[in-house]
Amino acid sequence: MIRTPKHLTKQESVNLGAYYTPPYLVDCAYKLLKKHVGIENYTLLDTACGNKEFLKLHHPKKIGADIDPKCDALTINALANPKRENYGISQDEPLIIVGNPPYNDRTSFIKQDIKNKDFIFEIDNDLKSRDLGISFLKSFAILKPAFICVLHPLSYLIKEANFKQLKLFKDHYRLLDALVVSSKSFTKSNEFPIVIALYERGRMDYADIRRFIFPTDCDTTLCLNDFDYIANYVDKYPNAKKVGACVGYFFPMRDINALKRNKTFLNAPSANVVRISQDKLIYYQYIHYFKEIAPKIPYYFGNLDIIIDHFAFLEIKDAFLKDKRARLEYFKKLFQGHPCEFD
C-alpha cells in the first residue's frame, strides 16, 4: 500500500515529496547503519520526519522535525538557514542524520500533470536544486553529522549531471555502503531504483560512483563500470548542427525508463529530434529493439543509459537486425546474472 499523509491532497503530497517509509525499509536502513557504527553514542536527527518512522526505535536522544505543522515534531523548514542550534544540538555533539527526505524532480515528466512548478517554500540559494532531495542532501552537509543514512533516488549518484549538483554534499561526504531497493513501496507505476545510502565524512567524485558496487534487493549487484553505454556511440539529444546528410529522425533519449515511455523513430523533423546519419543508423535500430526488452530487465537498470556490448553487437549486427532469436540470445548474455523475464 502506498502511504501518504492523510491531511495532504495528492498534489500537495507530490509537491512536498511526502510519502511515508514502510517499516521494513527503515529496518534495512538501520541494519546498514549498525553494520558500521555503534549508534548509541550519537544523537539521531530526521529533518523531514513525517510520521517519525525513523525515530520509533529506543534511543537515548532522537530528534524529529518537519515543515508540516501537523506532524507531531518540531516545525522547522530544513532548507532555510539550516544549523544545529535550530534543533537544540550543540556543535560538538556526535550526530547521525537519518530518514527519507522528500524528493520531487520538477523537470521530470512523472506526474507532471499535478506538479506545480510555482509551489514555493523558502530554500536558501546555495541549497536550491531542481529536486528537493538534492537540496536536503546539501542541507545535511551544513549540519556536519558524522554519518548520514537516508533513502534517495539512485539517480542522484549514477547520473553525472545530478551528481554535479551535489557539490556541497559530495565535497564533504563519501558513500560508505548502500542497498538498492525498488520505488514500488512509494509509487504504483514508473518503478525506479532508490538507494538506502550510508555516507561518512570525506569526499567523492563521479569515478568513485562508477566503481562502487551497489548491492540490490534482488541479491545481485550493480556497478556502472561493468557496462558500456550507447551514449558513447550516438547522440541522445537534438543535434541538427552536427549531422549533414540525414537518413531519419529519433526521439531524444534520457535513460532506460524514459525509453520505455517514449517513441523511437519519428516520421518528420522538428527542432526537438535527433537526426540520424547513415553510419549511426544501426545504433538507433539497436535502441529500437532495446525498447522491446526494457520492461523485462530488473528495475535497478532504469536510470542508466541504454546498455550495449559494442564488440558483441558489431559481430552479429546483421543477424541482430533480422532475427529475433539472435537478439534474444544477445540480450540474455548482456544481462547474464541478473533476474530478467526473457521468454
What are these regions (language model features)?
Residues 1-80, 317, 324-343:
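Class I S-adenosyl-L-methionine
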Residues 54-55, 105-108, 156-160, 206-207:
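Short catalytic/ligand-binding loop motif for oxyanion handling, primarily in non-cytosolic enzymes
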Residues 77, 97-104:
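Amphipathic alpha-helical repeat scaffolds
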Residues 126-183, 197-198:
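Conserved Class I SAM-dependent methyltransferase catalytic core
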Residues 75-95:
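Short amphipathic alpha-helix with an adjacent loop that forms part of the alpha/beta core around
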Residues 107-129:
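Mobile active-site "lid"/loop adjacent to the S-adenosyl-L-methionine
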Residues 245-343:
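C-terminal target-recognition/interaction regions appended to catalytic cores
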Residues 190-246:
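Flexible, glycine-/basic-rich loop-and-beta segments that form/coincide
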